[in-house]
């Protein structure tokens, strides 16, 4: 229990900022693991299809969005694994990816196969008659 508390203390302490702390923590961990290809926030915002200022406000919880796809795009840009994406969605107050939903299932398959290119994910969605994940979808 002590280990769990230490690892999750920031998310527990201030629930209004839990999403922010979680996203930054996961991105920082990935930057340590993949030091040869560092993730920059400006690139994550660009990949997600939003301006740097708007993306920063969403990530810092200064503005709220009801656009679940935007949060998923942030996670895909950050190369999050499925469990990390679902945690981020839950912390933001959105439903996690659900395998019985056809569109979510396509996204899950892409993530589980480590396809983090939005174009590839969009192609898979379109081939299945589903709405793109990209901002222009």
Language-model features, listed with the residues they occupy:
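Glycine-rich phosphate/pyrophosphate-binding loops
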Residues: 80-86
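Short, charged recognition helix plus adjacent turn
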Residues: 86-114
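Short, leucine-enriched amphipathic alpha-helices that occur as contiguous helical runs
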Residues: 16-20, 52, 103
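Recognition helix of helix-turn-helix/homeodomain-like DNA-binding domains
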Residues: 48-66, 91-93
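Short, charged amphipathic recognition helices of the HTH superfamily
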Residues: 29-45, 67-71, 102-106, 117
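Short, basic-rich loop-to-helix N-cap that marks the start of a DNA-contacting helix
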Residues: 62-77
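A short, Lys/Arg-rich alpha-helix, primarily the initiator
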Residues: 2-41, 119-136
